[in-house]
């Protein structure tokens, strides 16, 4: 992802408009830049310790109920909040760490990475992307996704 792509994402977020459509477009741009087929953005309800799906691209329809609400500490997105940093998997289908829940394996995703969305130093959500093939996102790709997470921070309300 080049600086121009970050600028493009920033521009989409600054344009405003309908929040769900804006987040969906930003997610689509991020996925294209990182050659990914699936993506989710979750907003954190820190009081209830739940992540709520606010945008997704590429998930099978039957998975939407599974990822609609995720408790902090559960699954890849929930673990991202607990760690306060990235969670990556080379192949979600063969993961034995216990982080990827059985339902997540139904997505067909191989490589995956999820990072916090921050407003300042406060985690306000997560952004996760994945690909259908076995793939380990590089530290550079993860770092760029974290930059996007900071851009998204003010867009989650």
Where are these regions (language model features)?
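Short, hydrophobic-rich beta-strand element in sensory/regulatory alpha-beta domains
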Residues: 27-31, 37-43, 78
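Regulatory sensory and allosteric helical modules in signal-transduction proteins
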Residues: 44, 50-52, 61-94
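Short hydrophobic/glycine-rich mini-motifs in sensory/regulatory modules
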Residues: 117-127
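A short, aliphatic-rich beta-strand micro-motif
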Residues: 110-118
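Short beta-strand-to-loop transition segments that serve as allosteric relay/switch motifs
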Residues: 126-136
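Signal-transducing coupling segments at domain and membrane junctions
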Residues: 50, 60-63, 90-111, 131
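Signal-transmission linkers at sensory-effector interfaces
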Residues: 1-21, 32
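Allosteric cytosolic regulatory segments
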Residues: 146-154
């Amino acid at each position: 992802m080049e600086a121009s792509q970050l600028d493009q994402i920033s521009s989409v977020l600054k344009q405003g408009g309908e929040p769900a459509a804006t987040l969906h477009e930003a997610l689509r741009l991020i996925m294209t830049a990182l050659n990914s087929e699936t993506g989710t953005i979750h907003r954190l309800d820190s009081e209830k310790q739940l992540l709520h799906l606010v945008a997704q691209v590429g998930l099978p329809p039957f998975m939407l109920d599974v990822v609609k609400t995720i408790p902090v500490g559960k699954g890849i997105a929930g673990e991202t909040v607990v760690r306060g940093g990235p969670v990556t998997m080379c192949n979600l289908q063969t993961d034995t760490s216990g982080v990827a829940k059985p339902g997540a394996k139904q997505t067909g995703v191989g490589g995956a990475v999820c990072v916090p969305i921050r407003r300042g130093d406060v985690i306000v959500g997560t952004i996760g992307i994945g690909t259908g093939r076995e793939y380990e996102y590089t530290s550079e790709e993860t770092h760029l996704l974290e930059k996007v997470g900071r851009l998204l921070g003010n867009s989650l309300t």
